[in-house]
Amino acid sequence: MKKRRKICYCNTALLLMILLAGCTDSKDGEAQQPSNQASAVQTDEKHTEPEESTKIRKDEAEPITESEESATKAANDTSSAEEKSKEDNVLAAYSSEKIEYARVWLQLGPNQEIDELNVRHIAAGEPINPNDDTSASYPENVTQLAGSRLVDGSVTYHGNGDGTIHVYNVPLRWDSADDIEKGVMREVTESIIKNRKTVYVDTGDDEKIKRLIDIMMIH
C-alpha cells in the first residue's frame, strides 16, 4: 500500500514538473515574439529612413537644377538674339568712321546719284583756300566729302563725336586768286569759319549707307 502511494506521488510530481516546463516555454516564446517584432520594426525604420532622406535631398536639388536650366536657356536666348541682331544689321561689318562719312553725305550731299564718294582729311591749321596765301585756316580737323565730278558738290565738316557735326560752307573749287581783289579772300574764309553750322546727323537708311560705303575712296 505504501509502495503504491509512493508511485502515485512520483507520478503527480512528474506531471507537475511537465506542466511547469510547458508554461515556461510558452512564456519564453511569447517574450521572444515581441522581441522579433520589435527587431522587424527597427529594420523597416532603417530601410525607410534612407528612402525619406534620399527623397528630401532630391527635392532640395530640383530647384537648383531648374534654376540652372533657366539660366542656360536665358544665355542661349541672348546669344541667339545677338546673332540675329548682327544678321539684321547690314552695317555691322563696317567701321564707325565709314558709316559716319556715308551718313553725312546721305543727309547733306548735293547729289545722291554719284558713282564714287571721295573722302579727304584736312588738318587744323590748313588754309581753307589752299590757292590763296591770305586765306584763313581751319580751326579744327575737318573731313571733305566729294563726288567724282564737280557737279556732285562737296561737304566739309568736323565730327564732334556726339552725333553732331560742324559744317563749313566751303566750295569744292575756288576761283583763281588773280580774279579776286587783295584782302577779299581773307574776309571770305573768316566768314566761313564764323558761319559754320552745327548739324545733328541722322542714322539714315542702312541700305543706302552701305551703297555709299561700297563706292567710297579714302585719300
From Swiss-Prot:
It comes from the Bacteria. Residues 32-42 have a biased composition (Polar residues). A lipid is attached at C23 (N-palmitoyl cysteine). It is found in: Cell membrane. It is a lipid-anchor. Its main location: membrane. A lipid is attached at C23 (S-diacylglycerol cysteine). Keywords: Cell membrane, Lipoprotein, Membrane, Palmitate, Signal. GO terms for cellular component: plasma membrane. Residues 26-89 are annotated as: Disordered. Residues 43-61 have a biased composition (Basic and acidic residues). Residues 1-22 form the signal peptide. This is Uncharacterized lipoprotein YdeJ. The lineage of its organism: Bacteria, Bacillati, Bacillota, Bacilli, Bacillales. The gene is ydeJ.
